[in-house]
């Protein structure tokens, strides 16, 4: 078993396992060691993993002949369940913070355990837009690929936000991401995962090369712009705004691809 342990740690299995436990509700063998120190480098891999699960469900429901809108609602429901609402909680808290006109009080409002009216509305908007965007695709192969692009590049936006902007709280779940990130190697790894994963799945699903190239560039631009916009509103980022970057990037990427 010694060879297995060497291989496991050499290829970052302990870090991947920790990323699965932190970012998803998927199981991981409790006897396998995990290390949470640098899990942010695997966040785009988590996006690809989740998108493949959703893609399988989407394809299965399509094969069964389920109505498009109902099918999309089921897929989005599993999407929410697989993440445990981790990022959606950030959408709510960030919306409540943005509703405060005094910027100096926004962080305090976001720490309140109660969700305000703006937070509830933001959650509803995100879920509705995802559902209707998925239902609007006339090409089912493109809809499947859109899931991969949205989940992967949305999380790349979070990785970029961690790398580029200051973290506004000394403690919290997001602090360890900023503290432990090794900028160049981790950002490069996360970018390579989603670029090769997105392009590879695009070819596998028979997506036109011009669309693969254009959507890859556009998705990266959207994810960067969303992270930058939230950083401008708060003068940096928190764990909540990281979640908001993921969710709103996913929404905008889905909406953009639905127009093709």
Swiss-Prot record:
The keyword Transmembrane helix applies. This is Adenosylcobinamide-GDP ribazoletransferase. InterPro entries: CobS. GO terms for biological process: cobalamin biosynthetic process. Joins adenosylcobinamide-GDP and alpha-ribazole to generate adenosylcobalamin (Ado-cobalamin). Also synthesizes adenosylcobalamin 5'-phosphate from adenosylcobinamide-GDP and alpha-ribazole 5'-phosphate. Its EC number is 2.7.8.26. It is found in: Cell inner membrane. GO terms for cellular component: plasma membrane. It catalyses: alpha-ribazole + adenosylcob(III)inamide-GDP = adenosylcob(III)alamin + GMP + H(+); alpha-ribazole 5'-phosphate + adenosylcob(III)inamide-GDP = adenosylcob(III)alamin 5'-phosphate + GMP + H(+). It is a multi-pass membrane protein. Belongs to the CobS family. The keyword Cell membrane applies. Pfam families: CobS. It comes from the Bacteria. Signal peptide: none annotated. Keywords: Cell inner membrane, Cell membrane, Cobalamin biosynthesis, Magnesium, Membrane, Transferase, Transmembrane, Transmembrane helix. The chain crosses the membrane at residues 7-27, 45-65, 117-137, 145-165, 187-207, 210-230. Pathway: Cofactor biosynthesis; adenosylcobalamin biosynthesis; adenosylcobalamin from cob(II)yrinate a,c-diamide: step 7/7. Its cofactor is Mg(2+). GO terms for molecular function: adenosylcobinamide-GDP ribazoletransferase activity; cobalamin 5'-phosphate synthase activity.
